[in-house]
Each structure stands twice: as C-alpha cells, then as structure tokens.
Amino acid sequence: MDPNCSCATGGSCSCASSCKCKECKCTSCKKSCCSCCPMGCAKCAQGCVCKGASEKCSCCA
C-alpha cells in the first residue's frame, strides 16, 4: 500500500494535476504516474502525470 495513495499497490487511484502514487494507475485522468521527462519528450508529456523531475522516464523508453 502506497502511503501517498488510497489504493493498493498496482491498483487504481484518482489523481489531480500532480501524482504522488508510485505504483498506481490513475483512473480519473487515465494516465500513469511517473517522473517528468526532460523538455522535448512529447510522448511522456502526453501520457503521464508528473510526480517529480527525472532525466529518465519509463514513458519515454
């Protein structure tokens, strides 16, 4: 259970503009929670809700 999330690990949760859930899928915005990608990564910007800055992002792989 993620302390920042209202659901069990791997489950679903709702999120606002910023996401604190690490292992959850957001249901309200239909996007995964992940780290922000560097500028220029349109794929991550469109498919993720940022929870923090990072040089590497699973959505950009």
UniProtKB/Swiss-Prot annotation:
Alphabetized Pfam families for the sequence: Metallothio (PF00131)
Residues bound to a divalent metal cation 3: C15, C19, C24, C29
PROSITE patterns linked: METALLOTHIONEIN_VRT
Positions that bind a divalent metal cation 5: C34, C36, C37, C50
Binding site for a divalent metal cation 1: C5, C7, C21, C24
Coiled coil residues, start to end: none
Region described as Beta: spans on this chain: 1-29
Amino acids binding a divalent metal cation 6: C37, C41, C44, C60
Keywords: Cadmium, Copper, Metal-binding, Metal-thiolate cluster, Zinc
Alpha, as annotated region: 30-61
Alphabetical list of Gene3D superfamilies matching this protein: Metallothionein Isoform II
Tissue distribution of the protein: Expressed in reticulocytes.
Domain of life: Eukaryota
InterPro entries registered for this protein in UniProt: Metalthion_dom_sf (IPR017854), Metalthion_dom_sf_vert (IPR023587), Metalthion_vert (IPR000006), Metalthion_vert_metal_BS (IPR018064)
Residues the record lists as binding a divalent metal cation 4: C33, C34, C44, C48
Any one Gene Ontology cellular component term annotated for this protein: nucleus
GO molecular function, a single term: metal ion binding
Residues where a divalent metal cation 2 binds: C7, C13, C15, C26
Residues annotated to bind a divalent metal cation 7: C50, C57, C59, C60
Disulfide bonds: none
Subunit structure: Monomer.
Purpose of the protein: Metallothioneins have a high content of cysteine residues that bind various heavy metals; these proteins are transcriptionally regulated by both heavy metals and glucocorticoids.
Entry text on domains: Class I metallothioneins contain 2 metal-binding domains: four divalent ions are chelated within cluster A of the alpha domain and are coordinated via cysteinyl thiolate bridges to 11 cysteine ligands. Cluster B, the corresponding region within the beta domain, can ligate three divalent ions to 9 cysteines.
Family: Belongs to the metallothionein superfamily. Type 1 family.
Name under which the protein is recorded: Metallothionein-1L
Name of the gene: MT1L
